[in-house]
Each structure stands twice: as C-alpha cells, then as structure tokens.
Amino acid sequence: MIDKSAFVHPTAIVEEGASIGANAHIGPFCIVGPHVEIGEGTVLKSHVVVNGHTKIGRDNEIYQFASIGEVNQDLKYAGEPTRVEIGDRNRIRESVTIHRGTVQGGGLTKVGSDNLLMINAHIAHDCTVGNRCILANNATLAGHVSVDDFAIIGGMTAVHQFCIIGAHVMVGGCSGVAQDVPPYVIAQGNHATPFGVNTEGLKRRGFSREAITAIRNAYKLIYRSGKTLDEVKPEIAELAETYPEVKAFTDFFARSTRGLIR
C-alpha cells in the first residue's frame, strides 16, 4: 500500500505488497521489494534498493546506491525469510550495505535510531547497532557484531564477527577489532588495543566530572592494576553502586564472549 501523500518517482519500482508511509519520498530508479515497509517521512534519494523482509522507520534519509535487506553473505543461508529492521531519523549515505539476518543468528539485523552510516559502510547479517552511533566511511561490521549506543567506528575499520563494541566507544580509523571493546574506551590499531577513556566524548554528552573520574578508575582496574578480570569484577561492581555509569562495565562483562581487547 502506498499512502496517498507519498511521492514515488515515475522511474522507481515499488512492488505490489510494499508499504510506503505518509509523506515518504521514493526517488528516481529506486527499487522497493514486496515485503518492505517504509515509514512516514523517509526519503530514498535515488538508485536505492530495499529488498527482503525489511522495515524502515520514520524520517530516515537514504542516499543513492544504498542496498538494504539484500541476501546476506553467509554460506549457510538458504533463502529463509529473515529480516532487517531500521529505526528512525538515520542518515544512510551512499553505497551503504545492510544485509538480512540468518536463522542461526536469530534472523534479524537491527539498526536503531539517529545513526550516521557514512559512505560504503557495511553492516553484515545479524548485527545490532544501537542509537546515535557513527560508522565512518568504509567501516565494516562482520556478522553478529553488536555496536552499543553512541559508539563511533572510524573509517576503514573492520570488526570481527561476534565482537561487541561498548557504549561511547571510539575506535580509530584503519583498525582491526578482533575482541570486545568495553564501554567508554578509545581503541586503535590492528589488532586494536586500548588507549584510555573517551573523556572528550563523555564531556560532550553531559557526563559529570565525578562520573568520568569513576569510569577512569574502572578503566585503571581493568587495564593497569595487574589483576585478572575476574579479580577486578567485584571492585567494579562496588564502584557501580555509587556511580551508576560504571554499571555499563558490569553489564558488558556479562555479555562478552570473545574476551577484551588488551
């Protein structure tokens, strides 16, 4: 169904069964598949392909040659009706690719809201990207990667499958991330190693001086105390009782399966 207030360019192809919301704009030479839902106010500039069982929310801007919901590159994929879900107010720039999930990975590739995906970024099957994240030009997420809120992935950086990038992380450009990056950390290199706390980013987002100090103390326990992670976990949990921002570390430890960058 195409809402009567939506605009569809005469050269675009919207297949029967697709849903186009109010005030959406489907530009020249775009292709929208039969199981696609485009939300209110979302704009497909031109030459955009949206395929598969894909749901895109409101007020997104999707630029030319982006491909969303296409068959993933997992060799086990056998055509199952897996999905892509994208939230609201994202800017998805030229030639970005976002692939549908796999049955083995839960069947869903999910992108939240208010993200900037720069030119040529790739989000593989079963990835989860939170809110207000930035993937710079040519950043690549392998399958099953999780990127938490406010994380920034630098240009030409590759993240290994199943890795977790914590909230407020800054990964420098041209890096290779092979293990999990705890929240608030700056990471750089191939393989990526930690370079302290992203204090400038936290200041910009309104973290108090006391909270930043507590986060830095937790970082020092993990990386500079000479103790094992199991040894510092109780100390970090105790610190989190006073400073709720530190709880992001304890929650992260519970999710981590690949070990932390060192």
Swiss-Prot record:
Keyword annotations: Acyltransferase, Cytoplasm, Lipid A biosynthesis, Lipid biosynthesis, Lipid metabolism, Repeat, Transferase
Function (record text): Involved in the biosynthesis of lipid A, a phosphorylated glycolipid that anchors the lipopolysaccharide to the outer membrane of the cell.
Underlying gene: lpxA
InterPro entries: Acetyltransf_C, Acetyltransf_C_sf, Hexapep, Hexapep_transf_CS, Lipid_A_LpxA, Trimer_LpxA-like_sf
Record GO terms (molecular function): acyl-[acyl-carrier-protein]-UDP-N-acetylglucosamine O-acyltransferase activity
Cellular component aspect of the GO annotation: cytoplasm; membrane
Catalytic activity: a (3R)-hydroxyacyl-[ACP] + UDP-N-acetyl-alpha-D-glucosamine = a UDP-3-O-[(3R)-3-hydroxyacyl]-N-acetyl-alpha-D-glucosamine + holo-[ACP]
Species for this entry: Shigella flexneri serotype 5b (strain 8401)
EC number: 2.3.1.129
Complex formation: Homotrimer.
Broad class of where this protein is predominantly found: cytoplasm
Pfam assignment, any one: Acetyltransf_11
Protein name: Acyl-[acyl-carrier-protein]--UDP-N-acetylglucosamine O-acyltransferase
Top EC category: transferase
Pathway: Glycolipid biosynthesis; lipid IV(A) biosynthesis; lipid IV(A) from (3R)-3-hydroxytetradecanoyl-[acyl-carrier-protein] and UDP-N-acetyl-alpha-D-glucosamine: step 1/6
Family that this chain belongs to: Belongs to the transferase hexapeptide repeat family. LpxA subfamily.
